[in-house]
Amino acid sequence: MYRTIVAMRFRALWRRIGADEFDLAVAQAAPGMRFTFVGDIPLGTSVTGTDALRAWFRQLDELFPGIHLELQDVIVKGWPWNTTVAARLHITAELQDETAYQNHAVQWVRMRWFKMTDDWVIEDTVALAAACSVQSAARISPERKTG
């Protein structure tokens, strides 16, 4: 029963995150939570704390305005004092050059008493790096490109 409740809450949370309500994810985090987004890319990081998580979501939103994150599957194991959640995500966005970006990610979350203590995300970094390059190039003015 507990795992069903956690899965339902996780799905509900991701529906809201998918609608750009990123602060809800931050609200679900314990104060000293660790967040890791794997990869040597602009969004790659390993940080601690809710302020750092909030800053990462701001960076994501600035780099990919209108990004859509959709939970496709979730698996829950454990008990309230030590819960593990594995999720499969689908990511879509329209890039600055008007091409479509699509990717998949896996999220591995540890929770204690319904608060995230560890959040580890891995996305196809080759596709993400290419999309980051498109977004960054579009932010460079023509004067800077030629100068």
Each language-model region and where it sits:
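Short, low-complexity N-terminal intrinsically disordered segments enriched in polar/charged residues
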Residues: 1-31, 136-147
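A solvent-exposed, acidic/Ser-Thr-rich amphipathic alpha-helical stretch
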Residues: 23, 30-78
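Short, solvent-exposed coil/turn segments at beta-strand boundaries
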Residues: 25-29, 79-82, 109-116
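Short hydrophobic/aromatic-rich beta-strand segments that constitute the beta-sheet cores
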Residues: 35-37, 87, 118-119
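Short, cysteine-centered beta-strand-loop-beta hairpins and adjacent loop/turn segments enriched
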Residues: 63-66, 92-102
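Hydrophobic/aromatic beta-strand elements that line small-molecule binding cavities or substrate pockets
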Residues: 71-76, 90-92, 104-110, 120
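A short hydrophobic beta-strand element
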Residues: 81-91
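Low-complexity, intrinsically disordered terminal/linker segments enriched in charged
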Residues: 118-147
